[in-house]
Amino acid sequence: MVRITCTISFSTDDEPVGRSRQGSFDDHYKRVVWSKDGEQGKYQEEGDDPDAYDGPEDEEAPDISLATFFGGCSLHGANHVFVEDKKFSIRQGLWALVFLLAISMFLLQVVDRVIYYLQYDYVTLLDERNAKNMTFPAITLCNYNTFRRSQLSYSDLLFMGPLLGYEDNMAPGIPLAPEPDRQGSRFSLAEFFNRTRHRMDDMLLECNFAGKECGAEHWREIFTRYGKCYTFNSGQDGRPLLITTKGGMGNGLEIMLDIQQDEYLPVWGETDETTFEAGIKVQIHTQDEPPFIDQLGFGVAPGFQTFVSCQEQRLTYLPPPWGDCKATPIDSDFFNTYSITACRIDCETRYLVENCNCRMVHMPGDAPYCTPEQYKECADPALDFLVERDNDYCVCETPCNMTRYGKELSFVRIPSKASAKYLAKKYNKTEQYISDNIMVLDIFFEALNYETIEQKKAYELAGLLGDIGGQMGLFIGASILTILELFDYLYEVIKFKLCRCAKKKHQRSNNNERGAVLSLDDVKRHAPCDNLRTPSTYPANMLPHHPGQGNFEDFTC
């Protein structure tokens, strides 16, 4: 016995006439699920796994309309512009105009604040602070006369003639010293500087610091452009740094010096090493900063007592883009701490080594010392050119933190007529010698305080954000949480769009894998058996009252 099952669909009267069967079939569909025993089961949407079916309906799509969002958003005014289920009215138009005006004013203020922030302005703050004690600065001094005449020999004049302006046909005009024992070695410029220098033991007559006696052993030798010089409280001789606990005269350094004018060289000619001055040059600096006394020192004359009242100044500068200070460590083979003087000495040394293949005696490094001829022909002119004209080679930026000392100088005549005889007798000199050679130098802190000069950012990022937040609240009544709401809304919209696109792709993929599917409504509308006609004759393979159909229609009928 042959069992034939036929599914007949019935069309309703309100079915659109002429609707394409294939179109109705493709628009909406649900799969007919058959159980294993052959009985009809449940319907479910295409693309779902029959074994994982949980219910008859899909998850409800989120409401992402602007009206719904702005109705619950904290952004003021937008809920009057975007109104749900209501046509655009004049009231909404006025609110939209006011809302756009507020947005424009807010953006204008934001642009103005951002432009001001990008100018990177700064202000300078000046303050004075007291201290219980203060570190005394380093004091470097040099005699204006570099070489002592009593130490010059005839060979010294021959070698050093180009540097001193002496020529072979000139009479020395001074008694010459015996030839030094060089033990077969060649003439050495460093040895000559050391042998002919003014000695601190001979120059220093009296020395006191804060009422305590000091001596030549407290002064460290150092080379500068003036030859051999001496630094007090250098911090590099194994001694602790000196501390002062009081301000005013008598609480600092007080020294009496003999500048030894009778040892000054005669002027044979004008060179860079020739001096016309008598006295000493002094520089007050920190222990971390090498002396640059030829450009930063001040002169002290004999026959006067000079009072130098100091005030420590601590300066703080801003790095780019607000300022132009140097915040990175120094890139030098000679110095560990960056300072303008360290940068200048390092740069001048490299410049001379590159252009003259030698270095001056006061310059660091291991390059050979320049000969007197190289001094005259190359080193001195190159250094003068570098200092006076070439501003591009040695560009030394200001360090972001530095200490300098402000100075106020005052003078009194010394010796008085009453004290001249006493001093002449005390030091076994004539009164004229005392008047021409003796000087007294007092260096002290004016008060036990220091001055701070600090650059501060005129407008920082926190101020910019605060101004933007204030303008945002003033014009549109928004806050940072409002911005988060906007981002959350955009996230939901993008997620919904992406998920819908992914679902469509998944549905198309399932259609291709599983074949055609059919919903109940489509089955009714499609009506594959509605073309039944009265047959006259039937082929052997065709059932009665069934015209020829497609594969799927044959299956359903």
UniProtKB/Swiss-Prot annotation:
InterPro entries: ENaC (IPR001873), ENaC_chordates (IPR004724), ENaC_CS (IPR020903). GO terms for cellular component: dendrite; plasma membrane; postsynaptic membrane. A motif (GAS motif) lies at residues 477-479. Glycans are attached at residues 133, 194, 401, 428. It is a multi-pass membrane protein. Disulfide bonds join 142-229, 207-214, 325-400, 343-396, 347-394, 356-378, 358-370. It is found in: Cell membrane; Postsynaptic cell membrane; Cell projection, Dendrite. Keywords: Cell membrane, Cell projection, Disulfide bond, Glycoprotein, Ion channel, Ion transport, Membrane, Postsynaptic cell membrane, Sodium, Sodium channel, Sodium transport, Synapse, Transmembrane, Transmembrane helix, Transport. The record marks 128 as: Involved in channel desensitization. Its main location: membrane. Residues 1-98, 492-557 are cytoplasmic. This is Acid-sensing ion channel 1B.
